[in-house]
Structures are given as C-alpha cells and as structure tokens.
Amino acid sequence: MVRTAVLILLLVRFSEPAEHCNAQMNSGPWRIKNLSIAPPKETLQKDVEIEIVETNMDENVIIGYKGYYQAYAYNGGSLDPNTRIEETMETLNVAKEDLLMWSIRRQCEVGEELIDQWGSDSDNCFRNKDGRGVWVFGKELVKRQNNNHFARHTCNRSWRCGVSTAKMYTRLECDNDNDECKVTILDINGASINVTENTVLHRDGVSMVLKQKSTFSRRPEKVACLLIKDDKSDPRSVTREHCLVDNDIFDLSKNTWLCKFNRCIKRKSENVVKQRPPTWRHDVSAKHDEGASATKGDLMHIQEELMYENDLLRMNLELMHAHINKLNNMLHNLIVSVAKVDERLIGNLMNNSVSSTFLSDDTFLLMPCTHPPPHTSNCYNNSIYKEGRWVANTDSSQCIDFNNYKELAIDDDIEFWIPTIGNTTYHENWKDASGWSFIAQQKSNLISTMENTKFGGHTTSLSDITDMAKGELNAKLWSFMLGHAFSFMLTVGVIIFLFCMVRNRSRAY
C-alpha cells in the first residue's frame, strides 16, 4: 500500500510541467502605469494671413553744393588803421530747379573767378554773389589773399560747387491706428530726415532732394507661424508667435506693425499675448539699436549662445537615443513573448517565410516554410487562410475576392516643422550710404583748400612759393637789383678814377 502511494506521487511529480505557476499566491489587481504625455508648448499654424508693405532699400537723392571764398582788402600803409583784409566764406542754398538742372547736365553753375581785382574793379566783390554764368563739372575754390596795391582796394573771389546722384537708405514706417505708411530717408546716424521730391533739405553744407517720389507696395500673404505658450493652464495665451516670411523669421505676437528697415508686416492675432517672463535668452525681447556697429564682444556673446544651444541639443539627442534603445529592448521582449504563440511572427518581421520553435525562454530555432505567391483571394489551391493560418479547404463558398479593398485610417500622420535658420537680411551701416560719402568728401576737400593760402594775383607763382605778398616781393626784388646796380656802378667808378690818376701821374714824369 505504501509502495503504491509512493509510485503515484512519483508519477504526479514527473508529469508536472517544467514551470509551475501557483494561482493561490496571486497579488493585485494590478494595472500598467502609463507615462504622462505633456502636450508641446509649440503649435504650428498654417495659412496665417498677414499683410506685407515693402519699399526699396535705398533711394536716389540729388545732392549739390555751391559756395565761395572772398577776400576784400585795402592797403593804406602800415600807419593807416584801415589797412586790413575782410574774409568771407559763404555756402549758398541750391534751389530745387537748379538741382534738377544740374543733375540733367551733370554740371554745376558758379560765378566768375575774381583774381587780383583792384581799384575800381574791386567793386566786383559786391556783385553776382548768387553765382551764375559759368558751368563746370565740379570745382573746388582757391583761397587767395593779396593786398599789394597801395591806397587801393583789392578783391579776390573763388567758387566751389559739385553735384551727385547718390543712394541713401530708407525706412518704412506704418501707423498702427490707420495702417497708413510712409517712407523716410535716413541720415548718417540712422535718424529720419525731411527730404522729399518736393522739398529741398539744406544741411551739412549741401542741398538735397529726392529724384523721384518714394513708393511702396502692399500684398497679402499666407505664411506658417509657430505659436509658443509658456502658460500651459491658459490655452489661448501666447508668449511668442514666430512666422516664416520669405525665409526670414519675424515675431508677430502683437497686433501691431513690425517694421524692419524697408519692410513692415502685420497680422491680426487671435490669441491673448501675455507679458513675456523676465528671464534671459529667448523669452526676453531682443535689445538692439538699428544701424549701430557690433563689437567683438557682441559676436563672442552670440558664439557663446550658439555653443550653449548646440550642447543642449546634443544632450537632448543623447537622452532621446537612450530612451529609444530602451523602447527597442522592450519591443524585443514583447516580440519574443508573442512569438511563442504566433510562430510566424519573427519571420514576418524579417520579411522571410520561416517558423520559430522555442527551446528556452529566449532561444529558438527557425525552420523554412513555403509561402504562396501574391494573391487577391483568401483561397489558394485547396487551402484557405483562416485565423492566421493556411488550412485545408473543401468549401469554395468561403472564398472571398479582396482585389478592391479599402484603406481604413486608424491614426493620423504627424507633420513636423523642420527647424531652419532664418535667412536674416543684414543692413549696412547708415554712414556707408554713397550719399553721405559724397558729402564727407566735399567737406574734406574744402578743409584741404582752406589750409593753402595764395597771396598773389595774376602770374604770381613765385610769390606763392616764397609765401610773400606781391608788393612785398616786388619791393625786395627792386631793392636787391638797385642795391647791386649801385654797388656795381660805384665799383666801376672807383676803378676808372684810379686808372685815370695813375695815367696822369705817368705823363707828368
């Protein structure tokens, strides 16, 4: 009896499976904890309607200048208190009609040069001060001063002029209330100046007028905008709204005109824009001074920000790579688990017709299998595809033709907005405009010529070289010649007298 009981126990023991699960020691119930998925702060909106107003980056400006230097002198001798030289340096305003004519002829009009006009001719210093009658391609004055006519007045006058059609940068400005826009011209410091096609502006020693009226164009356009929300609790709160316009990035968060140089952009924002948080980096509006030159420190700061962004991106990529690998390992475990039920799963994933047979928990064999050619029915020869397997079939009424199948979408494809660096439009410094270079050059020419004074009148190159007035030079030359002539005559007379004395004495003996 005892032997029988032991035999039964042994049979039960060896008939049990290799793995045993005890149902009486269960725990739970359990539920798999899903990770929370936070919605992104960024939202991409397509077909956002905006209005773009645009004008030319620069405009043609006619720049002209005209002026004269005059020296009116009187020579009454060193004892006369009226002996003096009255200098006048005058810059004349050029009228619009003159500027237009100068631009057409590519010449400027001045008055006649007055050189060493003395006596009654010196009255010319009081005539034709408006500079008419002489056309030149450009002229710089000569500073002449001479006062060598005793008891006479002397007049010297020299003219200067120039004309150029040059470029000056523009700025487009639009009013937020009535949406009216205007184009202004910028000076060397980037400030607006009042120069139009109808009004001549006189400044910095020149006169300037627009060659033609500035125009601008309006056009609607649909663009893509990226909305960034820093406040997750308020879905309609938008901190920034970056829109891609002509391959350039603009922040159109506010319902106002955003003007950059020669372009203004505006859209009607449907969201409520909150005050930006007072933190550094992209959450703070950029501080910039248009037209100001960047320093080496500014560029190094930008480089530092780029390095930070690059390191941050690298860290996020490494974290994402590790997480993807973790998901892949979890997927491998899931495939192994399901493949123990579906022996064709591994082969289907490899796109190969094989069947798997597991030897242990993670070790298996692969066996080749036959696979029917492509078909449009669930029947093939004497087989039917049923519940994931090809089985024998004798009932042809179960065959279905699925050549005209329909696709059923169970999820939506995610469309990514690929990051790109904006094609930023860079602007040259305001003072680099050719118009201001022309003005600076004419000022430099005037300074150079005023440092060189001509003291003579007509044909007085020697007086210019010796830096003497014509009268002084003549006096010195005459005194030099007369003195040497007197010495020569005196010497010759003495020699003749001595010769005669010697000759008379020889006759007496």
Curated annotation (Swiss-Prot):
UniProt-annotated glycosylation sites, renumbered to this chain: 34, 156, 194, 351, 381, 423, 504
GO biological process: fusion of virus membrane with host endosome membrane; symbiont entry into host cell; symbiont-mediated perturbation of host process
GO CC field: host cell plasma membrane; membrane; viral envelope; virion membrane
Topology term for the membrane: Single-pass membrane protein
Gene3D superfamilies in the record: 2.40.50.710, 6.10.250.2130, 6.10.250.3010, 6.20.460.10
Keywords: Fusion of virus membrane with host endosomal membrane, Fusion of virus membrane with host membrane, Glycoprotein, Host cell membrane, Host membrane, Lipoprotein, Membrane, Palmitate, Phosphoprotein, Signal, Transmembrane, Transmembrane helix, Viral envelope protein, Viral penetration into host cytoplasm, Virion, Virus entry into host cell
Domain of life: Viruses
Covalent lipidation (O-palmitoyl serine), chain numbering: 479
Residues spanning the signal sequence: 1-17
TM region(s), chain numbering: 480-502
Record's subcellular location: Virion membrane; Host cell membrane
Principal place of residence: virion
Post-translational modification comment from the UniProt entry: Palmitoylated.
InterPro entries referenced in this protein's UniProt entry, alphabetically: Baculovirus_Gp64
Family that this chain belongs to: Belongs to the baculoviridae gp64 family.
Known role: Envelope phosphoglycoprotein which mediates the fusion of viral and host endosomal membranes leading to virus entry into the host cell.
Name recorded for this polypeptide: Major envelope glycoprotein
Lineage of source species: Viruses, Viruses incertae sedis, Naldaviricetes, Lefavirales, Baculoviridae
Gene: GP67
